Amino acid sequence: MVPTTSVRRFDEQFARQLREGDLRLNPFEATALPYLSGRVLDYGCGLGNLAVAAARRGCTVVALDASAEAIGHLRHVAAELALPIEAEVADLRTHVVREAFDTVVSIGLLMFFDRPTAIAQLEQLRSHLRPGGHAVVNVLVEGTTWLEMLDPSAHCLFGRGELARRFHDWTIVLNESSEYPGSGDTIKSFETIVASKPGN
């Protein structure tokens, strides 16, 4: 897999976070944590802070990311703490999920794909969640002006309310919009959804 510009930038960010010891859950991960149970797929896990927190709460976690830097760190932590985490480097644009999970999580990932890929991967995550399980998805949405980490020719800003529409046939447990300042005068506009798959 050839690293994309965004993967290289995240490698740099992760290296800086490790140097600074900044391993706190971000606000979206903190929101997700109470909904994680059973076997968890963390799709775009970054440094694995959420995967570690979930494993400490009794979950088993499959954690995937395109950053070798991040996965190397997570493997080290999981081994050191004897946590049930399988951490793998994967090209998440094309990765095929081959098992069902009790929880699927994708925080801050899908916007780095072109739109057809983002939608296809979202549908794949939906289809590999067991009935009664939770999906936790966080994306950048239209209105975002912070684009410096995104490939100009291949990114996806979801429409406002689009996540809720894509989960209309599930029970929506949480649907939040939030904004954060980016660099300069830019804005990051996010939507986060937690949805329960019908069944059980």
Identify the function of each model-found stretch.
Residues 108-109:
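Short catalytic micro-motifs in class I SAM-dependent methyltransferases
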Residues 1-37, 46-96, 113-120, 124, ...:
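Class I (Rossmann-like) S-adenosyl-L-methionine-dependent methyltransferase catalytic domain
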Residues 105:
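A conserved beta-strand element that flanks and buttresses the S-adenosyl-L-methionine
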Residues 43:
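Conserved beta-strand/loop positions that form the S-adenosyl-L-methionine
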